[in-house]
Amino acid sequence: MEIRRRPPNPPIKVDILQYQIKHPEAAPRHILEEIVWHKEKEVAQRRELVPLVKLQSLVKDMTPPLDFVGALRQSPRQPALIAEVKKASPSKGIIRADFDPVAIAKAYEAGGANCLSVLTDEKFFQGSFENLQLVRSAVQLPLLCKEFIIYPYQIYLARSRGADAVLLIAAILSDKDLRYFLKIIEGLGMAALVEVHTLEEMDRVLALDGVQLIGVNNRNLQTFTVDLQTTEDLFAQRREQLTQGDITLVSESGIYELADLQRLQQAGARAVLVGESLVKQPDPQQAIAALYGEV
């Protein structure tokens, strides 16, 4: 899947004037490309407010990140759970109107989640880095920053707000970027959850050094359709490489009930990332127990 990082006809500035040349492919081809194009602008604006060097200085004085990978691998409950703090999505709209990130995070922690994922994209998911910081102050669990990362700046921003791990989406990053970002993440003592959806993306990620977590997104980020068969197929085709590399497979999206957990665990998933089906319930703590068939 090819993702264009920018529109083919970017605005051109001449002194105080700005113009744009018409182009037949000037519109994003799908939602993922639209998100990436917006992220380009968003990161540029953030850099103007807080330079990268400031973020790098901030993270130097922070306590070391929590062990995100270890929390998943040492879980007595299988598959391990990454519970997501999520208000909305492009496909579902508002998932929880009375959204309180701290209350939800505390409920997840009380329910036995191993790690948390916090959405930080503002425009499409109504998340924020402020939410990440609030959650960090409220719970003791390792945190994943769920962001569409396309620049190192976002990695440092995530760490400065308390993230212990970040999401890297193979579909929107080149192999060169993935290698570079993995080195930055390792240098910060963080973990990377590298997300794939196709066999081609899986093979690209398996060829990289230092990958400990691979997330299989059961949701097609172009169409937003969901199929748990995605996890089953990819693990079946690359079981040997994943096992030999001691890589923990995380299944993401489309997980609603115990039967889904059992199906994915049988397929080879050692952890799951669950958001919508938990956050939309009145009591997220109780929702975790129900998901694992404990009530």
From Swiss-Prot:
Q: Which SUPFAM superfamilies match?
A: Ribulose-phoshate binding barrel
Q: Which catalysed reactions does the entry list for this protein? A: 1-(2-carboxyphenylamino)-1-deoxy-D-ribulose 5-phosphate + H(+) = (1S,2R)-1-C-(indol-3-yl)glycerol 3-phosphate + CO2 + H2O
Q: Is Amino-acid biosynthesis tagged as a keyword?
A: yes
**What's a single GO MF annotation on this record?**
indole-3-glycerol-phosphate synthase activity
Gene3D superfamilies the record matches: Aldolase class I
Pathway in which this enzyme or protein is active: Amino-acid biosynthesis; L-tryptophan biosynthesis; L-tryptophan from chorismate: step 4/5
State the CDD domains in the record.
IGPS (cd00331)
Which family, according to the similarity comment? Belongs to the TrpC family.
| Stated name of the protein | Indole-3-glycerol phosphate synthase
UniProt source species: Synechocystis sp. (strain ATCC 27184 / PCC 6803 / Kazusa)
**Organism lineage:** Bacteria, Bacillati, Cyanobacteriota, Cyanophyceae, Synechococcales
